[in-house]
Amino acid sequence: MSSYGGGYSGGGGGYSNNYDRNGGYSNGYSGSNGYSGGGGGYGSHGSRSYGGGGYGGGYGGGDRGGDRMAGLGSGLQKPNWDLATLPKFEKSFYKEHPNVTARSMAEVEKFRRDHNITVSGRDVPKPVETFDEAGFPRYVMDEVKAQGFPAPTAIQAQGWPMALSGRDVVGIAETGSGKTLTYCLPAIVHINAQPLLAPGDGPIVLVLAPTRELAVQIQQEINKFGKSSRIRNTCIYGGVPKGPQIRDLQRGVEVCIATPGRLIDMLESGKTNLRRVTYLVLDEADRMLDMGFEPQIRKIISQIRPDRQTLMWSATWPKEVRNLAADFLTDFIQVNIGSLDLAANHRITQIVEVISESEKRDRLIKHLEKIMDSRDTQNKCLIFVGTKRVADDITRFLRQDGWPALSIHGDKQQNERDWVLDQFKTGKSPIMVATDVASRGIDVRNITHVINYDYPNNSEDYIHRIGRTGRAGAKGTAITFFTTENAKQARDLVSVLQEAKQHVDPRLLEMARYSGGGGSSRYGGYRGRGGGGYRGGHRSAAHSGANAVPVANRRW
């Protein structure tokens, strides 16, 4: 079997960073958005032209309602795949390094135990312990080493040999574990071994992601590690104009990263096809199912040849994800990093404070004063709230109190969301207020603190929220405000805290014992103060106004 197809021949037309052509951050913003510049690109459009920009209404390109999601893909016809007549393709590239071959199974099992790796399936390859052992081509390894990583992460050590072997793979690992590179680097090798794209061909590699933020981040990784090659890629997601995305697809791209709704829109309108896809990635599969994308995922996969290689990545392994894997993966091998039971990252210090709604603002300020005490610490704080209105209220309150906070939620236009995320990533605005939906897929490294201003609906969302900190081996702190309104969640929260060997507030323990009714009067009644206690605050529909409020008497 040949190794890597004998060098990189490209795909014609040169490498392009299509996201920049879609507008990037360069258009400027105007009016109530509070940004200087303005004119051109997305910033000059009125907010109505984005169809709400949300996850229900945004996928159709901005001018069609959220209920269109229900009918997405109804016009797609399932191809009649005849494997006997389909062109053959190469998908097995792994050649075990002599060092790996020489390791005994006892040594392999010790490595897996030390790194919390468990595997299942037939003939799972041994893990690699160094980048050189993975056997990637020189042009890939040069980019990896340039990033300064000391060694592969656990998911990479086991996942690279699995992906390079051409097998279908399931990977269960927390976000921030390095899984994006686990499938991106083998994707580059896979593309290198395929025939060049012909006019009218669709992509060779398709990556499906739940949100546009995650899709853009995946593209940035592919850009980074494909810099020395000539792989072309594009990012397809809703909430922005279709024109630049259509142009990219029609020019030809080897890699397409997409959210399900916008991709189906492109397929139905004939702007692209999936006939050439031989490497399929489902990233954050559990989140895609949580967000109701299962029908769209099934329709998309029906458009791809059945002998493709499929890699499914998920932070959790619930029944719905298992069913999807059983339906669309063949003889798959599986790698799990850590426990399959839902559990919090043990590197995160969890602090839960039982307080009333009316105490939240003052308590938030006290924590921010400690967190942001020194500019040298480069701390970043992500604040989770329950609604878009509270996100705007909190942001306005913090900015008026001198804190450089910005908010992100589903009603924000895409260009503003990109700008806010960039400000947070770079530390120019080290405090970000977010709702759950807007935060999904956001992968910002070095978040030191998470504050749950409003407690989420369940312990799974709690674990996902606090998992934004403590990534890639770092430590983190999660602070949670818990009120009588959340009493029904007390028992589950206590279980999470005890499993992670965290301190449990005696009041929370007592609440867990009496948590049958939610909001027991023994804790006082703070009912009716939902939305964070902002009785006199802004109550209109969420706009960009909160991010435009001047920061008064900066406290940081």
Swiss-Prot record:
Question: Can you name one GO molecular function term for this protein?
Answer: ATP binding
Catalytic activity annotation: ATP + H2O = ADP + phosphate + H(+)
Keyword check for Cytoplasm = yes
Q: Which UniProt keywords apply?
A: ATP-binding, Cytoplasm, Helicase, Hydrolase, Nonsense-mediated mRNA decay, Nucleotide-binding, Nucleus, Ribosome biogenesis, RNA-binding, rRNA processing
Write down the superkingdom of origin: Eukaryota
Tell me the leader sequence span: none
Annotated compartments: Cytoplasm; Nucleus
Biological process annotations from GO: nuclear-transcribed mRNA catabolic process, nonsense-mediated decay; rRNA processing
Q: What InterPro entries does the entry give? A: DEAD/DEAH_box_helicase_dom, Helicase_ATP-bd, Helicase_C-like, P-loop_NTPase, RNA-helicase_DEAD-box_CS, RNA_helicase_DEAD_Q_motif
Q: Which CDD domains match?
A: DEADc_DDX5_DDX17, SF2_C_DEAD
Q: What residue intervals hold the motif DEAD box?
A: 283-286
- Give the residue ranges for region: Disordered: 534-556
| One GO cellular component, as annotated | cytoplasm
Query: Pfam families, from UniProt?
Result: DEAD, Helicase_C
Tell me the ranges covered by the Helicase C-terminal domain, including all copies.
347-512
Taking every annotated instance into account, which residue ranges of this chain make up the domain Helicase ATP-binding? 160-335
Domain topic, free-text comment: The Q motif is unique to and characteristic of the DEAD box family of RNA helicases and controls ATP binding and hydrolysis.
Family designation: Belongs to the DEAD box helicase family. DDX5/DBP2 subfamily.
* PANTHER family xrefs: ATP-DEPENDENT RNA HELICASE DBP3
Q: What is this protein called?
A: ATP-dependent RNA helicase DBP2
